[in-house]
Amino acid sequence: MINKQRLLDEFLELVQIDSATKDERKIADALLAKFRALGITAEEDDTGDKIQGTAGNLLAVMDGGKDAPALLFCAHMDRVEPGSGIKPQIKDGIISSDGTTILAADDVAGIAAILEGLRIVKERQIPHGRIEILFTVAEEGGLYGAKMLDASKLKAKAGFFLDAGGPVGTVVVQAPAQKNFRAVIHGKAAHAGVAPENGISAIVVAAQAIAKMNLGRIDQETTANIGLIRGGEATNIIPDRVELVGEARSRSSAKLEKQVEHMEEVIRRTCSDYGVSADIKVSDSYGAFSLNQNDFVVKLACQAAEAMGLEPRLESTGGGSDANIINGYGISSVVLGMGYDHVHTTSEVMPIDQLVAAAAYVVSIIENS
């Protein structure tokens, strides 16, 4: 059913188009041309202007005469670094880079699978209802494309995001919310050689606070991390300012609040012990979603997998994706496993048979809707 060579050629073509976060212009233009060739109406929004990027989200619609719920298929156009000048290699049915860059199967595999699926639907004249295709920008940079989207343009009742690890047939039905955490600790400067006793090191205070925090894997639903520390000016100055940047995630809103409160309390208590102060800011990054096997989108994903002879696997994840944002807009959405591995590393790989299966999965979802 799937034109394997055409799909492979398109994947190899797209991974070689540089598409860093907020610099997706080249791949956006290529995809707009592909939509035109397919006879599918597509438009680009103004997200690029809003986030100071070079391209916006692409939203395409393929209308059909079938009385069926509208479906949304989504993938993101950007990729992590090092993702420029990718030179794909094929060995024993596995696609990889030359080892100096990522492969960008995350998420070119999703884009290619969707496009091939649409071609098959057209070529075989498979009856379908309204199909919406969303290719977002700046997913890797903080889900900015999805956050800036005008959701009123989406009519879909179910969303399928081709952007997860695990073999094809994996259906991610739960993902955490994330809060961003930023604290600036204000110490007291002094000459480190002449009068260190007159200073209070903000770095020491920060180190003591971090050592007291519960971080990493808190429980099966909750994680926390301090990922950035910025501070100090010179070795001969007791540092009077340090910035800590971190996050907390959980599939439980109560646990998420508790973790963030714990991190804030530890910093304030430690600052109090040293007689210094801190400015702390907590902000929402994205919300959680949790679906079950009775939800239409999950039923359809499972039915489509079974029609292919696959055993659907319902999974939870600790990561966020555009699906978190779209679920927040009221469109029940799942994330589908693509079969790639070692994403965000120079060891990233994409088995060709999984790429073919992902495209077939798109067709099966449409057929079974």
Region spans (language model):
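N-terminal capping segment at the start of a domain
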Residues: 1-25, 284, 341-345
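Zn-dependent metallopeptidase/amidohydrolase metal-coordination segment
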Residues: 7-8, 56, 229, 240, ...
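Short glycine/serine- and small hydrophobic-enriched flexible loop segments
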Residues: 13, 115-122, 208-214, 364-367
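A non-catalytic alpha/beta surface segment that caps or lines the substrate-entry region
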Residues: 20-67
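Acidic, glycine-rich active-site loops and adjacent beta-strand->loop/helix elements
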Residues: 48, 77-79, 134-142, 164-166, ...
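Active-site metal-coordination/substrate-binding segment of hydrolases
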Residues: 53-54, 61, 67-135, 152, ...
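Midchain, well-structured core segments that form catalytic/ion-binding scaffolds
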Residues: 85, 91-101, 138-287, 317
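Short, low-order "capping/linker" segments at domain edges
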Residues: 289-304
